[in-house]
From Swiss-Prot:
Keywords: Cytoplasm, Schiff base, Thiamine biosynthesis, Transferase. Gene3D superfamilies: Aldolase class I. 1-deoxy-D-xylulose 5-phosphate binds at G157, A184, G185, N206, T207. The gene is thiG. Catalyzes the rearrangement of 1-deoxy-D-xylulose 5-phosphate (DXP) to produce the thiazole phosphate moiety of thiamine. Sulfur is provided by the thiocarboxylate moiety of the carrier protein ThiS. In vitro, sulfur can be provided by H(2)S. GO terms for molecular function: thiazole synthase activity. This is Thiazole synthase. It comes from Rhodopseudomonas palustris (strain HaA2). It is found in: Cytoplasm. The lineage of its organism: Bacteria, Pseudomonadati, Pseudomonadota, Alphaproteobacteria, Hyphomicrobiales.
Length: 260
């Protein structure tokens, strides 16, 4: 179980609801992933009209917890307004907070992110901020009241995997009581397993599953990878070494193989 604010969730894989080839494949992929939390864009819901209503019906059929996001927002004001609309529409205080600074990299505006998090937390929101791997930013978000931090592995949709491994490890070491979720940039199941091996509580995926040749099979692969990575972390991974260490005992080695 992993704790998100005052709720305990069984699956450590969070999944997005965009970019799938069809609504049916989206539903099947989410089911196969075993995810309990699904992110949804308010912009898609608000602008979709009848199509938006149909999409929302599909999500409700899955029986999952909805995590609305502020995707596409590029200012504090826009993000705060979108979050308030999402609370009214979805009936939840949860919000995945995104404030984007750059169109090419989709890098978070960390200054605006902290400001928006402060405003929303004071207004009763439980904020899931999408941020960089910068420790100082994460600490400011914690000071703003965030109990969940979602640093990226790499730019959104890049599929590059974990680029700044040491920085993500530092976040885990310095924020032991905060729920940490790797969000964005994961492209392969092995990337998700690596994040879990670092001790992260969960990962959030969308493009890597939705854009796979077989999204449903890829959802299953990521589910297994997350489980394997977490199990490995809990089992206690041996540390890396600079030199070889024999795994076969020398006791009982034939004398003619012994080193003089």
């Amino acid at each position: 179980m992993v704790k998100f604010y005052d709720r305990e969730i069984s699956s450590r894989l969070l999944i997005g609801s965009a970019l799938y080839p069809s609504p049916a494949i989206m539903q099947d992929s989410i089911r196969e992933s075993g995810a309990d939390i699904v992110t949804v864009s308010l912009r898609r819901e608000a602008a979709g009209g009848k199509a938006g209503d149909q999409f929302w019906s599909l999500i409700r059929e899955l029986g999952v917890t909805v995590l609305p996001n502020t995707a596409g927002c590029r200012s504090v004001r826009e993000a705060v307004t979108t979050a308030k609309l999402a609370r009214e529409l979805f009936g939840t205080a949860w919000i995945k907070l995104e404030v984007i600074a750059d169109n090419d990299t989709l890098q978070p505006d960390v200054v605006g992110l902290v400001e928006a998090a402060q405003i929303l937390t004071k207004d009763g929101f439980e904020v899931f901020p999408y941020c960089t791997e910068d420790l100082s930013v994460a600490m400011r978000l914690v000071d703003a009241g965030c109990r969940v931090i979602m640093p990226w592995a790499a730019p959104i949709g890049s599929a590059r995997g974990i680029v700044a491994r040491d920085a993500l490890k530092l976040l885990r070491d310095r924020l032991p009581d905060i729920t940490l979720v790797v969000d964005a940039g994961l492209g392969a199941p092995s990337h998700a397993a690596e994040a879990m091996e670092l001790g992260y509580d969960a990962v959030l995926l969308n493009t890597a599953i939705a854009k796979a040749e077989d999204p449903v099979a890829m959802a299953r692969a990521f589910k297994l990878a997350v489980e394997a990575g977490r199990t490995g972390f809990e089992a206690g991974l041996m540390g890396a070494r600079d030199f070889a260490s024999p795994s076969t005992p020398v006791i009982g080695t034939p004398f003619w193989h012994a080193v003089s």
